A protein has these predicted regions:
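Acidic, Ser/Thr/Pro-rich intrinsically disordered cytosolic tails and loops
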Residues: 1-194
Length: 194
């Protein structure tokens, strides 16, 4: 679906965080604490991504991330042999559309948040992801994804005083929808700029 590289990298990061393979220790510059042992079921590009973030030298990290991307593209090119590119794109567009429809159709903030968490990678494929996320979560409370504490270093340790309650890993805390949408979109933009 030819998305910008920064969006692809963010999708990989979120997938890794959802699987519990790492947590963000700082956002700028992005630093990860990698789980040991790694959880089962990671894709090769995910383990390559994590290996790149174990490198402390910025040039070495960039080189390792570049190699990961080249390897991922080669792998996808090989897997696409014999398939119609047009039909494949239409298929993934329909999955993305269905994912958004399920989020939008949810009747309660809890269900909407749960559906969004489940469909995050598919919704991120949307070129209008930023605006659509803001529109959908503009009003009402939103429950952070259960893995969000791995992405937002301040989220897990927020102790009173603010509008975001302290979070326990795996628990869900509610925030105003606009705040959540801004947090997701800004997190993606910040990661993309690193």
């Amino acid at each position: 679906m030819e998305r910008p590289l920064d969006k692809v990298m963010t999708m990989i990061l979120f997938g890794i965080l959802k699987k519990g393979a790492a947590r963000v220790t700082t956002r700028e510059p992005l630093a990860l604490e990698i789980t040991d042992p790694l959880p089962e079921g990671l894709y090769a590009y995910e383990t390559d991504f994590l290996a790149a973030f174990q490198k402390t030298d910025k040039v070495e990290r960039q080189k390792a991330l570049s190699e990961m991307v080249v390897s991922l593209i080669k792998s996808l090119t090989e897997k696409m042999k014999g398939f119609s590119r047009k039909e494949t794109l239409e298929y993934y567009q329909s999955i993305m559309k269905t994912a958004w429809e399920q989020v939008e159709a949810a009747n309660t903030p809890e269900v909407k948040s749960e559906r969004y968490e489940q469909a995050l990678e598919w919704t991120m494929l949307d070129k209008d992801y930023d605006d659509r996320t803001r529109d959908i979560f503009r009003t009402g409370p939103v429950f952070y994804p259960t893995w969000w504490w791995r992405f937002d270093p301040g989220h897990a340790s927020a102790a009173g005083g603010g509008s975001i309650p302290a979070a326990i890993p795996g628990s869900r805390s509610a925030v105003p929808g606009a705040d959540f949408a801004a947090s997701v979109v800004n997190g993606i933009q910040n990661f993309s700029s690193n």
